[in-house]
Amino acid sequence: MAISPISLWQRLSYRSGSLNCQFYPSCSNYGAQSIAQHGVILGSALAADRIARCNPMAYHYHIKAKEPLFHNDGRLLNHVPIKLFSDTKGEKSPALASVLSIVAPGLGRVYANRTWDGLFGLLTVATMANLTYKSHTNNSSTGTVIFGGLTATFYLGEIIGAYQAAVEANNRP
C-alpha cells in the first residue's frame, strides 16, 4: 500500500525521457527501497529527503564528496543508507543540523553547506503546509489529511536530511 504512489509515478515517468532521474537508483526506486528497509515512516522521510536533494545542484554537491561514485550510465550513485544515524567527528554537528531543521526546515542543510538543498526543502515543506492550511480552511478533511501527511513526511525528511548532510560535510576532503 505504501509504495502504490511510487508505482503510479513510475508508470508515468518511465514513459518520458524528460523525467529521467539523475540518481541511481532513481528517486522512485530509492523511495521503495527506503520503505522496505526502514519502514513506512522513516522510509517515506528518506524518500522525501531524496526528492529535496534531486535538484539542479545535486551534481555539484556530489562531486564534492570524499569519494563521489557514479553508476556505469553516468548517474549519481546514492544508495539507501543501511544505518540512519552514526557517530561522526568534524566541524559540522549532525545534532545541531537536525535541531536547526526542526526550527526552520532547510536551515540544517544550509548549516551543512548545502544551501540549494535547504532552499528546495524549505519550499517543499512550505508548499505542503500551505496546501494543508488551504484544505483545512476549505473544510476538506481528505485534503487536510493527505497534505498534512505529506507536510509531516517532508518535514521529517528535512530533519533526517540535515543530519546526513552534516555527516557528509564532515567526510569531505
Model-derived regions: residue spans:
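Hydrophobic alpha-helical membrane segments
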Residues: 1-173
